[in-house]
Amino acid sequence: MASPSHPSRDCSQVIDHSHVPEFEVATWIKITLILVYLVIFVVGILGNSVTIRVTQVLQKKGYLQKEVTDHMVSLACSDILVFLIGMPMEFYSIIWNPLTTPSYTVSCKVHTFLFEACSYATLLHVLTLSFERYIAICHPFRYKAMSGPCQVKLLIGFVWVTSALVALPLLFAMGVEYPLVNVPSHRGLICNRSRTRHQEQPESSNMSICTNLSSRWTVFQSSIFSAFVVYLVVLVSVAFMCWSMMQVLRRSKQGTLAAQGQQLQLRKLESQESRSARRQTIIFLELIVVTLAVCWMPNQVRRIMAAAKPKHDWTKSYFRAYMILLPFSDTFFYLSSVVNPLLYNVSSQQFRSVFGQVLRCQLTLPHANQEKHLRAHVASTMDSTRSACRPLIFPASQRSSSSARANMVFLSTFHSEAKPESKPQELSCESPEPNSERKPANPATRNGFQEHEV
């Protein structure tokens, strides 16, 4: 008999054995999902494969740092594994034919573990890529000490090891079991199920599904809730790093515009490419945050629903809400891996151009230094021609106008600000004449000194 504190009740709203076949969705949903999954699978595999090739081309041509390339390649590989490991098995065992016998326990465990590991590898890759850009933009001096092939390998290794640890509990908590088996020592609803068919032999009637094992309920709950915390931490961290990077770029822009003088105007011109690349990175990371929030949240809600209470305590409305959410959450989750190549194309015109070239198998991208070397060579040739055709001593007005134009072309070939070691060289370039007027920031004076030396 039930204890007086927990009287036996007839829970008419709680699901029973008659609802177990409803774990299999309707036929029209199956057909719709197979078409949607097929499109997502092809686009996802193709997009991420081309992304790997594009990043390698950009890195070889000098447009992308090797550290960023390694992160993007590893992220694309994790997305591809999500499709290869997760989509076929999940569609067959959860959507198309969820009701089976306990003989598929090993495949259920292995699939769940690998799928969870690859999914969170994608999530953590977004975190490490954001962290790498955050250090490069907000802490550039630390970036040189923290960047490098060894550090990148350690970060990527950290991602995969952590993902495996996050997924490891599911290797023990998942299996093939009748979904309405009572969880031992669980204080849930106490209902009179004497008139239901819970005591039938589900093994003989093919009523088992790949689900959490009742004997490992605590392990399953801990795994799902811990993974959800990891998801929230990644979202908050990436959002914070994007906000910090935007603040740094905004302060840098305001400082350049507020300054006066020829030298600071040249600094604005020479750093325009680097600031444009940084803006593209931030746009990409912002879109990644939105994607993670929109595409991952339905799947996280469904997982929380599964871990909040055992299935034998689910009400009919709770069960129907779960089954309605199931196809939508899975579809949006796979879209998060499809959308990464799309975000690369949206946030970077250069990436979009090379992406199209790779699809057409016609690579026409020149090396990044080719145009710079050409401009420098033309500027050097013109400067040598002028120096050979004019006298050594010029009036101050002519020297100022001509040398300012020459230095404008010369300094435009640089893409980073002068290092502190270059300051003594600027001081040594002053004219030795005591009566001459000179300003350290005036490019005409420096060019005049070069003519004086000639």
Curated annotation (Swiss-Prot):
Kindly give the PROSITE patterns that the UniProt entry links to this protein: G_PROTEIN_RECEP_F1_1, G_PROTEIN_RECEP_F1_2
Which cysteines are disulphide-bonded? C11-C191, C108-C210
Q: Which InterPro entries match?
A: GPCR_Rhodpsn, GPCR_Rhodpsn_7TM, Zinc-sensing_GPCR
Does Hydrolase count among this protein's keywords?
A: no
Q: Which GO terms describe its cellular component?
A: plasma membrane
For this UniProt record, give its keywords in alphabetical order, as a comma-separated list.
Answer: Cell membrane, Disulfide bond, G-protein coupled receptor, Glycoprotein, Membrane, Metal-binding, Phosphoprotein, Receptor, Transducer, Transmembrane, Transmembrane helix, Zinc
Residues carrying a glycan: N192, N206, N212
| GO BP annotation list | G protein-coupled receptor signaling pathway
The portions of this protein that span the membrane are 35-55, 70-89, 110-131, 152-172, 218-242, 284-305, 324-344
* Modified residues annotated as Phosphoserine in this record: S397
Any one GO MF annotation of this record: G protein-coupled receptor activity
- Name the membrane topology term: Multi-pass membrane protein
Region called Disordered, residue ranges: 415-454
Q: Which SUPFAM superfamilies does the annotation name?
A: Family A G protein-coupled receptor-like (SSF81321)
Q: Which residues lie on this side of the membrane: Cytoplasmic?
A: 56-69, 132-151, 243-283, 345-454
Would you say which domain of life the source belongs to? Answer: Eukaryota
Tell me which tissues or organs this protein is expressed in.
Detected in liver, kidney, abomasum, uterus, small intestine and colon.
Provide the function of this protein.
Answer: Zinc-sensing receptor that can sense changes in extracellular Zn(2+), mediate Zn(2+) signal transmission, and participates in the regulation of numerous physiological processes including glucose homeostasis regulation, gastrointestinal mobility, hormone secretion and cell death. Activation by Zn(2+) in keratinocytes increases the intracellular concentration of Ca(2+) and activates the ERK/MAPK and PI3K/AKT signaling pathways leading to epithelial repair.
Oligomer status and interactors? Interacts with HTR1A. Interacts with GALR1.
Q: Which family does it belong to?
A: Belongs to the G-protein coupled receptor 1 family.
Query: What name is this protein filed under?
Result: G-protein coupled receptor 39
